[in-house]
UniProtKB/Swiss-Prot annotation:
Subcellular location: Cytoplasm
UniProt keyword Lipid biosynthesis, yes or no: yes
Reactions it catalyzes: D-glucose 6-phosphate = 1D-myo-inositol 3-phosphate
Cofactor(s) the protein requires to work: NAD(+)
Protein name: Inositol-3-phosphate synthase isozyme 2
Pathway(s) where this gene product acts: Polyol metabolism; myo-inositol biosynthesis; myo-inositol from D-glucose 6-phosphate: step 1/2
Any one GO CC term of the record: cytoplasm
Organism: Arabidopsis thaliana (Mouse-ear cress)
Function description: Key enzyme in myo-inositol biosynthesis pathway that catalyzes the conversion of glucose 6-phosphate to 1-myo-inositol 1-phosphate in a NAD-dependent manner.
Tissue distribution: Expressed in siliques, leaves, roots, seed endosperm, but not in embryos. Highest expression in seeds. In leaves, only expressed in hydathodes and vascular tissue.
GO MF annotation terms: inositol-3-phosphate synthase activity
Length: 510
């Protein structure tokens, strides 16, 4: 059975006019290596930590500024939200299609809340806590091309032409602000698009972005702003002692107009200085050590890296299944070809390397979890190939071969062919990222013994379900297995309303 909404009734939960307060027992385990009668033993000790959660239920008017607004992802997301808001339908060769948010965790997925008369009860994911309605979001952003969003939508060749015709009046007056352009960080083939750029030194560019954000907030009367990078993949920045290794050195390098500070890092600096959440949707190392240090010192949310939409999402499920089933993956070969602007930019070796790193690390934690299958330091052979084929446009092809060792020296091979409509998969992920980033800024908590409430760590691991290479605080384990990432996100939000984590034991039926 599916219900649209619910309210938790518990002595541990209190609803007020502007808040939900919950007291939550977090049950975990501590592992110690102890000397017992002269012999060291591993001992696992269950423990319970009491947490207080406080969620502000006042939903703000949200502004979202996209870096690369005129790209395939930005134009597709904007078009999709408008189509939903206006209730637009359009004819395809198969049927009359209604606008929807399929592919969005927050808007189109469900959670289990319990059982009723022997039937499982589910509710929308977004019913857990008050979230911003996508149709109330004010979109804007920057681009190195001055093309309006209607023409950008047509150039992208993602949406059906009947839908594009209906959306054009809503989008033709949407024009991105000029963006920061540095040809050293992206492929040379992007130069033909760069007709709307912010001039000046890097310090002047940061100041320009800050001015743009302040004016956007004032013009649109938004309460909060989230900025997300959905522009070209950049090459990796060199992390150099004295250049970008500390906050002091990074800001000094901006002042000195050092060439190795990337455009994405400049946008992120501007956001952190303004206390505005910044999310990196591409694979480059935007968050150099000095920037992470700055975000932590300012308690400003940062998240990334790289949208997890197609091939990598499948990989984070399949390898988790194989290792969890006691099957040993020994070779993973991933081949992609695509024909959109992302593919053209990735045809340059230096930008492809950023994507290769992002895609290749996704199985590390799953391999490390099973010392029966893998010796220390052992790892499957893992190769990623990306080629540019203009004809296929946004319809990316992903082909994977997984070779594994099975019982008694046997071999198992799984081959997948995945046609990923690149921007149609990425757009709802962008939506989820900005909505969850905003929501997380309204949640505070404290553990038993802590005096004051505080927010989540500025490095937002809560967003890791949506990213290929999750950014985590220093010293924090990286989790890539998709099921674990979703469980973490859902269970944290459940804790905010006093619900137990979904453990799937269902003891009432045993």
């Amino acid at each position: 059975m599916f219900i649209e909404s619910f309210k938790v009734e518990s002595p541990n939960v209190k609803y007020t006019e502007n808040e939900i307060n919950s007291v939550y027992d977090y049950e975990t385990t501590e592992v110690v290596h102890e000397n017992r009668n002269g012999t060291y033993q591993w001992v696992v000790k269950p423990k319970t930590v009491k947490y207080d959660f406080k969620t502000d239920t006042r939903v703000p008017k949200l502004g979202v500024m996209l870096v690369g607004w005129g790209g395939n992802n930005g134009s597709t997301l904007t078009a999709g939200v408008i189509a939903n808001k206006e209730g637009i339908s359009w004819a395809t060769k198969d049927k009359v299609q209604q606008a929807n948010y399929f592919g969005s965790l927050t808007q189109a997925s469900s959670i289990r809340v319990g059982s009723y008369n022997g039937e499982e009860i589910y509710a929308p994911f977004k019913s857990l806590l008050p979230m911003v309605n996508p149709e109330d979001v004010v979109f804007g952003g920057w681009d190195i091309s001055d093309m309006n969003l209607a023409d950008a939508m047509a150039r992208a060749r993602v949406l059906d032409i009947d839908l594009q015709k209906q959306l054009r009046p809503y989008m033709e007056n949407m024009i991105p602000l000029p963006g920061i352009y540095d040809p050293d960080f992206i492929a040379a083939n992007q130069g033909s698009r760069a007709n709307s750029v912010i001039k000046g030194t890097k310090k002047e560019q940061v100041d320009h972005i800050i001015k743009d954000m302040r004016e956007f907030k004032e013009k649109n009367k938004v309460d909060k702003l989230v900025v997300l990078w959905t522009a070209n993949t950049e090459r990796y920045s060199n992390v150099i002692v004295g250049l970008n290794d500390t906050t002091e050195n990074l800001l000094a390098s901006v002042e000195k107009d050092e060439s190795e500070i990337s455009p994405s890092t400049l946008y992120a600096i501007a956001c952190v200085l303004e206390g505005i959440p910044f999310i990196n949707g591409s694979p480059q190392n935007t968050f150099v050590p000095g920037l992470i240090e700055l975000a932590i010192s300012k308690n400003c949310l940062i998240g990334g890296d790289d949208f997890k939409s197609g091939q990598t999402k499948m990989k984070s499920v399949l390898v988790d299944f194989l290792v969890g089933a006691g099957i040993k993956p020994t070779s993973i070969v991933s081949y992609n070809h695509l024909g959109n602007n992302d593919g053209m930019n990735l045809s340059a070796p230096q930008t492809f390397r950023s994507k290769e790193i992002s895609k290749s690390n996704v199985v590390d934690d799953m391999v490390a979890s099973n010392g029966i299958l893998f010796e220390p330091g052992e790892h499957p052979d893992h190769v990623v190939v990306i080629k540019y084929v203009p004809y296929v446009a946004d319809s990316k092809r992903a082909m994977d071969e997984y070779t594994s060792e099975i019982f008694m020296g046997g071999r198992n091979t799984i081959v997948l062919h995945n046609t990923c409509e690149d921007s149609l998969l990425a757009a709802p992920i962008i939506l989820d990222l900005v909505l969850l980033a905003e929501l997380s800024t309204r949640i505070q908590f404290k553990a038993e013994g802590e005096g004051k409430f505080h927010s989540f760590h500025p490095v937002a691991t809560i967003l890791s379900y949506l990213t290929k290479a999750p950014l985590v605080p220093p010293g924090t384990p990286v989790v890539n297995a998709l099921s674990k990432q979703r469980a973490m996100l859902e269970n944290i939000l459940r804790a905010c309303v006093g619900l137990a984590p979904e453990n799937n034991m269902i003891m009432e039926y045993k």
